[in-house]
Design a protein with these regions (language model features):
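Amphipathic coiled-coil signal-relay and dimerization helices
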Residues: 41-47
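A common structural microfeature
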Residues: 30-32, 44, 63
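Residue-level signal for well-ordered, solvent-exposed loop/turn and beta-edge residues enriched
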Residues: 40-41, 86
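Active-site-proximal loop and beta-strand segments within enzyme catalytic domains
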Residues: 25, 51-160, 168, 172-177
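Beta-lactamase-like hydrolase cores
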Residues: 6-38
Length: 177
C-alpha cells in the first residue's frame, strides 16, 4: 500500500471494508486501486490474491487483463489525434501509411479510421492473432493476408485485431507506445 500526502478524501471514498464487501459479493479474487491527484499517485493499494490457489497476494503492480476496455482507450487516443489535426476519421489509412494493405485493392484504398473503429472492414475476428502471439508491426504486415468474412463496409463484424492495428496507427503517429 502506498499513501502520499493528504489523501483523507480518497480514503473516505474508498474504504477497505467497502472494497472487501464488493469483492465478496461479486466473487472477485483481487483488485488494485490507484488515486491520482495533480498527476501524482496519492494512493495505490491492492486487495485479494493474484493467485488464489497458491495464496499469492495481489500488489499495486499486479497486471490485470482489461480485455475490451482497451478499445475505449484506443478510440479516445484516436479522437485526441483527430482533434489535434494529426488524423482524420474519413481519410483513407493508405494516405497516412503507404505500406497499409488489406485483402483487396478496394478495401486497401478506401479503409478509414471510421471503418476500423466501427468494425466495418469485413474482416473476420481472427482473434487468435491478437493475444500476444505477434507484435503490432508484424500484425500490420500480415493484415493483407487476413481473409474477409463479408464485403468491405457491408456489415459490422466485431474485431479485436483491427483495434490492435488502430493502436499501432496511434503509435506510428505519436512515436509513443
Amino acid at each position: 500500500m502506498i499513501h502520499k500526502g493528504d489523501n483523507t478524501m480518497a480514503q473516505k471514498c474508498i474504504s477497505k471494508q467497502f472494497i472487501e464487501n464488493e469483492m465478496e459479493f461479486w466473487k472477485i479474487p483481487s483488485v488494485a486501486i490507484a488515486v491520482v491527484k495533480d498527476d501524482e499517485i496519492v494512493m495505490s493499494e491492492a486487495f485479494g490474491y493474484k493467485d488464489v490457489e497458491n495464496k499469492i497476494p495481489a500488489t499495486p503492480k499486479t497486471q490485470y487483463g482489461i480485455a475490451s476496455c482497451s478499445k475505449s482507450f484506443t478510440s479516445t487516443i484516436i479522437a485526441m489525434l483527430v482533434d489535434e489535426g494529426k488524423l482524420d476519421y474519413d481519410v483513407p489509412i493508405i494516405e497516412y501509411f503507404p505500406d497499409f494493405k488489406m485483402y483487396d485493392e478496394f478495401a486497401t484504398k478506401e479503409c478509414t479510421l471510421r471503418d476500423m473503429l466501427s468494425h466495418r472492414t469485413g474482416l473476420a475476428p481472427h482473434d487468435a492473432l491478437w493475444i500476444d502471439t505477434i507484435d503490432r508491426s508484424t500484425l500490420w504486415e500480415r493484415l493483407r493476408y487476413l481473409k474477409p468474412m463479408a464485403p468491405f463496409r457491408a456489415q459490422t463484424l466485431y474485431n479485436n485485431t483491427i483495434y490492435t492495428l488502430i493502436g499501432h496507427i496511434a503509435e506510428k503517429i505519436t512515436g509513443q507506445t
